[in-house]
Regions:
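Pocket-lining segment of extracytoplasmic ligand-binding domains
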Residues: 96, 166-260
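Pocket-flanking alpha-helical
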Residues: 44-50, 70-107, 119-133, 175-180, ...
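Short, low-complexity disordered leader/linker segments with a strong preference
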Residues: 1-33, 318
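Flexible hinge/capping segments at coil-to-helix
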Residues: 24-28, 125-140, 226-231
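Secondary-structure end/capping motifs
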Residues: 41, 228-303
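A local structural motif
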Residues: 22-34, 59-71, 86-88, 159-171, ...
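Ligand-binding cleft/hinge of the Venus flytrap
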Residues: 49-65, 150-169, 200-201, 257
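Extracytoplasmic "Venus flytrap"
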Residues: 28-52, 146
Length: 318
C-alpha cells in the first residue's frame, strides 16, 4: 500500500441551512449533506439494507440533510477522500486501512466495529498441486496489499514457516485478482465474499481462510473534525446502525432476500455467507487486541512506519 495522501481540506457538506432537530441541546454548526461510503462486498448486509431501504435518508431528511453514498471500496481511496474532506463517514473500512491512515496523519476516529469475518477472507487457487500455504512457495499470488486479505496471506505463510519473500506477490484489487486466477496468469488469489463463493462454484479450491489467523475486523470510521462539529449527527448515525441490526435480526429472511438480489447470490448462498459474519457493533477487548496485532503485522511487514495509540483512535461519544 502506498502512503496515504495527507491533504486535509474543508469538510464537504457544510452550509448555512438550518437544522430542525430539536433533540440537540447545544447549537451546532449547520449542515446540508452527509457523505459516506457504500461498500457492499464482501457481504456487508447492514450497508445494503441501509441503502435499499433509505434508512439514513429517512433519519436525516427531517432536517433537510441529504445523504450521499459513494461507492469507494479501496481502503486507501476511502481514507484519502476522508482526509480531503470529501467524505464524512467510512462505513466498512478495513482495520488495516484505518490504522495505516491514522499513522500517516489522517485525522479519523473509529466509531464501532462493522463486522468480523475470518471465514470470509480466502486464498483460492486453480492449481491442483497447491493444497496448503506451504505449497505457495515460489508461486504467483495476487491480491490487494495492506488489507485483511493480505494479512491472511502473511499469517498463513508465517504459520507454514515462510514469509512474503517466498512468494511472488502481485498487488491488485479483488476483481483483477479473480480474473488473473481464472486466466491462469497467477497461481493463487486473495478473494473475499460473493466473489470467492462464485469462484469456488466455478472450480477454484480454498487454500485457507482467515479462520485461526485473523479476525477480519472491519470498522466504521468518521472524520475527527466532522465528529467534533456534529456530535449529534454522529449519535444519530450510530442509532441508525443499531436500528438496522435490530431489523436484520428480527427479519432475517426478508433482509437476506434483499441482499441476495443485490449481490447476485442465491438465498441459500447468502444465508451460508451470512453465517460467517458477526456484525455486532461493540468494540470488545478482543477487537482491541486484534487491532494491536494488526498494527504489529503492518509494522513488521514495513507497511506502517509510525506507531499509533489504538485506544486514541476510538471515538468517545459526546
Amino acid at each position: 500500500m502506498t502512503a496515504m495522501v495527507l491533504v486535509v481540506g474543508m469538510l464537504a457538506g457544510c452550509s448555512n441551512k438550518g437544522s430542525s432537530d430539536g433533540s440537540t441541546s447545544t447549537k451546532k454548526e449547520d449542515i446540508s449533506e452527509i457523505n459516506l461510503t457504500y461498500v457492499k462486498a464482501p457481504l456487508n448486509v447492514p450497508s445494503i439494507i441501509q441503502k435499499q431501504d433509505d434508512l439514513f435518508g429517512k433519519e436525516f431528511s427531517k432536517d433537510n440533510i441529504a445523504v450521499n453514498f459513494h461507492e469507494i471500496t479501496s481502503g486507501p481511496d476511502q481514507t484519502q477522500a476522508l482526509a480531503a474532506g470529501e467524505l464524512d463517514f467510512l462505513h466498512a473500512l478495513g482495520g488495516t486501512s484505518a490504522i495505516i491512515a491514522a499513522s500517516n496523519g489522517v485525522d479519523l476516529k473509529i466509531l464501532n466495529t462493522y463486522s468480523r469475518s475470518p471465514k470470509g477472507f480466502m486464498i483460492l487457487t486453480n492449481n491442483d498441486s497447491i493444497k496448503s500455504a506451504a505449497d505457495l512457495k515460489g508461486k504467483k499470488v495476487a491480491g490487494p496489499k495492506g488489507t485483511v486479505l493480505h494479512q491472511v496471506l502473511i499469517a498463513a505463510l508465517d504459520k507454514a514457516g515462510f514469509t512474503e519473500n517466498d512468494v511472488e506477490f502481485i498487488n491488485m484489487g479483488i476483481p483483477e485478482a479473480t480474473s488473473a486466477l481464472a486466466e491462469g496468469s497467477v497461481d493463487a488469489a486473495l478473494i473475499a465474499g460473493p466473489t470467492a463463493l462464485k469462484a469456488i462454484n466455478a472450480g477454484s479450491t480454498v487454500v485457507t481462510t482467515g479462520e485461526g489467523l485473523v479476525d477480519g475486523i472491519i470498522v466504521t470510521a468518521v472524520s475527527t473534525k466532522f465528529a467534533e462539529k456534529h456530535p449529534d449527527i454522529v449519535k444519530r448515525f450510530m442509532n441508525v446502525e443499531k436500528e438496522t441490526l435490530k431489523y436484520i435480526n428480527d427479519n432475517k429472511d426478508e433482509a437476506l432476500e434483499k441482499v441476495s438480489k443485490e449481490v447476485g447470490l442465491t438465498i441459500d448462498q447468502t444465508k451460508e455467507m451470512y453465517s460467517w459474519y458477526d456484525f455486532s457493533m461493540d468494540i470488545t477487548d478482543k477487537d482491541m487486541e486484534e487491532l494491536e496485532k494488526t498494527q504489529d503485522f503492518l509494522i513488521k511487514n514495513e507497511m506502517q512506519e509510525n506507531k499509533v495509540n489504538i485506544k486514541d483512535l476510538i471515538y468517545t461519544q459526546k
